[in-house]
Structure formats: structure tokens, C-alpha cells
Amino acid sequence: MNYQTIAYNVTDGVARLTLNRPERLNSFNAQMHEDVRHALAALQSDDTARVLVLTGAGRGFCAGQDLSDRTVAPGTERADLGASIERHYKPLILALRRLPIPVLAAVNGVAAGAGANLALACDLVVATRSASFVQAFARIGLLPDSGGTWFLPRLVGPARALGLALLGEKLPATQLAEWGLIWRCVDDEDFTAEIDSLAAGLAAAPTLALRRIKQAVHAAWHNTLEQQLDLERDAQRELGYSADYAEGVAAFMAKREPRFTGR
């Protein structure tokens, strides 16, 4: 499919989705929502994809909502922002979280508003040292959406979550990596190589195990310890019968690189 606002392809097990409105810092309009929704639906049914890399074109990752888009811009008739969230952002965040494969956010510049929370919805967030994050909502009279009020306190605690949300300060990715909000920062000149290396490594990893790891960590946010122990038991039982486990042990004993198939 020819997309108007994104680039999407799958090569060697790595799916890449690039938000492609660099002149607007890759902010979302109605067309971009449609394009991303279609790409994620295609990804769901693509058995060759083993990892998704989400990034932005140009100097920004994503500036959130394009406020000039007529569907959300204030005018004579006030736009229903709740309807926009229900139609676009809620399905987007849930679709990302529910993907069975690892999702890697490659934050190459500013991540603002819903764009920041789009990154936080991913499993791994790697940013350039020059990148920045800002919860810009309060500056225009709104609250963090796209899961912001859910992700922030869980990742950095209520004190820092409230500071980020109430003050709307732009903070460097280096500081947020120190806080544990994102996985790591990488020198700008090494960023592309680092993302490619991480993506290739995840694509070559035991897919079924990664899927169960992702599910278990997400479930831990609401499970009791006993429920989590039961989940680990059931998942480990399944993985213990997998071809990838047999291959992993055989490769370890033979001192060779494993060749995982995702089975």
C-alpha cells in the first residue's frame, strides 16, 4: 500500500514504521492515524515480522497532535477531543501494547505531547542524546492523554510524574534515561547503527520467549505475586516444550550461535 504520511516495510524480520511528516515534526493528523492503523493491522497478520521499530523522519520523533488539523482545532464549534481520543489515540496505544512482538521506539528528536506517550507505549525506548521529551498538555489547558497519566507514575513514580505533567518542562533524554523513563541514550552519530543492531538481535531471538516475557512484564503491573508466579509457571512449561528451547540448549552445549525459529 502507498502511504501518504508514513513509511512502512518489513525486511529480514524487522518491521519499520516511520512517521513521515517532517515539516510538522511528524505530528498526527487524521490521515496519519489512518495510515498507522492500516500498517499495524498489516503487521498483526505478518508472520515474518519479529520486531517493530517505530521512529520519525527528519529532526523529530513525533510532536503529538497537529493542532491545525480541523478535527481538533478550536473554532466556532468546539471540537470534541474525547471523541478524537476514543477514535484515534486509544486504539493506537492499545494496538501497540497488544502487539505480540517487541516494539522498539527509536526517538531521534523531540517527542512531545501524545508523541512522548506514543514512545512510552513501546517496549524499549532508545533516544539520541540530543532528543527531548515534553508533556506539553498543561501548556494548552489539557491533561496528558495517550496513556500518559498511566505510564508516567508507573515508570518514574508519582512525584516525577506530577512534575512532568504539571510543569510541562522539556527535559533531555539523557536525564530521562537516568530516571528510568526510557531504556537508554545513544550518541547521535551512533544512533542508527545502535537501532539496527538492537532490531537485528531481537529479530534473531526466540520469538515465543520474547512474547511471553512481554506478556508477563505487562501483567505484573496488576497481578499479585501469587498470580505472577502462576503465570511464570505456565509460560515456562510452554517454553520448555518449544523447539527454540531445545535449540538454545543444544547451541549452548555445542558452543555455537543458536538458530531460533519462533517455535
Predicted ranges, named:
Residues 214-223:
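Short, charged, surface-exposed hinge/linker loops at domain edges
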Residues 86-93, 199, 217, 229-232, ...:
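Hydrophobic alpha-helical core bundles mediating ligand binding, dimerization, or RNAP-core interactions
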Residues 41, 56-95, 111, 139-141, ...:
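Glycine- (often His-adjacent) and acidic-residue-rich active-site loop
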Residues 31, 35, 88, 95, ...:
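Charged catalytic carboxylate motif
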Residues 6, 94-210, 237-242, 247-250, ...:
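Crotonase-fold acyl-CoA enzyme core
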Residues 1-57, 94, 192:
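Conserved CoA-thioester-binding segment of acyl-CoA-metabolizing enzymes
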